[in-house]
Amino acid sequence: MPTTPERIRHVLARVQVLLLEKNAAYGDSALEPVRIFSKADPVEQLRVRIDDKLSRVVRGGSQADDVLIDLVGYLVLLLVAQERAEQAS
């Protein structure tokens, strides 16, 4: 039976793989959005995506595990976006 630290490493590895695969497929679209419709900055756009994921968790409509992994991924991206914003100012 895996230990708690092993489980944490496993979950974080899944999040890392997901983020790197999406970054390879879509580029930095979460951190550098095209802004065709919304003019919100990347931090605000990520907060909107996180709200959407939290709504799905509350409703339980999607595969719960996938939604939670996506949510953790968006939270990581939010931290990256906030760090970028702080460095730019």
Indicate residue ranges for each PLM-predicted region.
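Intrinsically disordered, low-complexity regulatory regions
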Residues: 1-89
